[in-house]
Amino acid sequence: MKSATCLTATVAAALLAAARLASATDMPSAEEMWKIIQQQQREIEALKRGQQETAEKVEAAAELAEQSQPSVSTASSWAENTQIGGYGEMHYDNLDSGKQIDFTRFVLFFDHQFTDRLRFFSEVEIEHVIASSDEDDKGEVEVEQAYVEYDLTPTQHAKAGLFLLPVGILNETHEPTTFYGVQRNPVETYIIPTTWWAGGVGLKGEITPGWSYDFDVHEGLDTSASDDYAVRSGRQKTSEADANDLASTARIKWTGTPGVELAASVQYQQNVTQGNDPNAGDAWLYEAHADIQRGPYGLRALYARWDLDGRGPKAIGADEQEGYYIEPSYKFTPKVGIFGRFNQWDNQAGGNGNNTEMKQYNAGVNFWPHPDVVLKADVQMQDNDGAKNDNGYNLGIGYVF
């Protein structure tokens, strides 16, 4: 027992001595310790710099994300508040005056809602496909609408810019899917010069439920004796328009029964030649119409008349220019409808001794394969005493989106 105890003590002493010897041998010097401390300090500083750079990158990324968010939101808001649309029509005319195919109109709409009360409307049109300086090209590029509208109240609105005048049935709504016949009717072409737009300001609103009004002040016509004072030739289209004599247009409209529109318009201009012709004076336009669609039955009727003052218009009978048409229609289905129309107009109805009255009969069919696409066909017959008749048929296709 005593031997075992001594052996244990001897082994322990030997191990302790070996450990002390090893510790003494492995212990770094003071210089080595200083180098180790400096290396560790450099590593700590490098880690701090890395952490700082990482923090700066994270902060920059966050700021960029914050800056990008309004841009994305703005782009999304712009897209939601902007609308693009348009319409177009192509005609094939086979008439006594000639045969032709014409892509008559290509139109695009661009509208934008700035706020709940402020909005913008525009319409750009290319007529006859090609517009150039070549005299053989009949095309035109036209801005027919570009105006801002503001809601004074929920039922009263003000506008300023370039807009369509509130006269007739077709002038404000003339997309090909909305009317019968390939060509627009002649009364709303030669007496009411559709499409008729002008630059100015206006008010419109509801008077009572079913009754509404429009009142506009805008550029006037600029007719001339060389064009027989024809009103269509006097449109200035707000292209450096002469504004010596402005015009005023007012309309009252009743839509108190679904499918029924009754309206009357009046326009006054102090001088229909903008003061350029001493033999011409003021001009008044009077127009009334009914547009009725009750079930499959439809009826459109319109009367319009111009009274032009002055010796010049009176000498050739242009002091009175008037016309009317009546157009019944019937829809067999929502896709197929037929119509007939009688048109009579005269741009020299003042009694100059010449028979200048024009009469035209149209009958045809519309087919809508889709509510926004239409195929049309009609026949045209004229009965003119003082001019050559232009008879034949027309085919057309139109769309709107």
Stretches with model-predicted labels:
Residues 329, 335-372, 376:
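Outer membrane beta-barrel transmembrane domains
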Residues 367, 372-373, 389-401:
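Outer-membrane beta-barrel "beta-signal"
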Residues 72-223, 244-261, 327-332, 336-339, ...:
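Outer membrane beta-barrel
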